[in-house]
Amino acid sequence: MAKKIMFQGTSSNVGKSILCTALCRILYRMGYKTVPFKAQNMALNSYVTKWGDEIGRAQVAQAEAAGIDPIVQMNPVLLKPTGNQSSQVVLMGKPVGVYSAKEYHTHYSLTALDKVKESLAFLDENFEMIVIEGAGSPAEVNLKANDIVNMRIAKMTQAPVFLIADIDRGGAIASIVGTLELLEPEERDLIKGIVINKFRGDIKLLEPALTF
């Protein structure tokens, strides 16, 4: 059984993908058979594996960092925006239809969860380390019931979670505290560390916030 670690963010674009990529490379250099995993990705541009399956490009970069070929199990669900609040759903590398956001979250996402579980089981059996990436924020209370990419995955795998915030855009501390407060106690227990990304300058200016 593979060991697992997960990166989640206080929002999109806080640096989850690049930190996952970096960790894949570090673990690869340490000699671990490592694989990236993101249950559900939203991206307009995809990559086609040598088996003809579409997956998100971020997982392709992470696979390269881990020294392996990209496979569909790294990203079983890909959402490709088509406009008008709808997306083409790509399941296990193949398009299965176009759904509105409401249709997907209320009728389809939990159906896709079976393939997510199958993908995780495959990776668990064939690798030593799984670097898991979340999406958006785990504290989106309006989407939580049908979540298949953040805390549902963390609880399913019991992966230690590191929460990332981007201090460069401001509001990092508030976003960290707000995210933690919106999590359920058993979810909060899975958070093992906080990453304040893109910090520059004198660390002493940050210390009062760290001891808050």
Residue ranges and their predicted role:
Residues 1-212:
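Flexible phosphate-sensing "switch/lid" loops adjacent to ATP/NTP-binding sites
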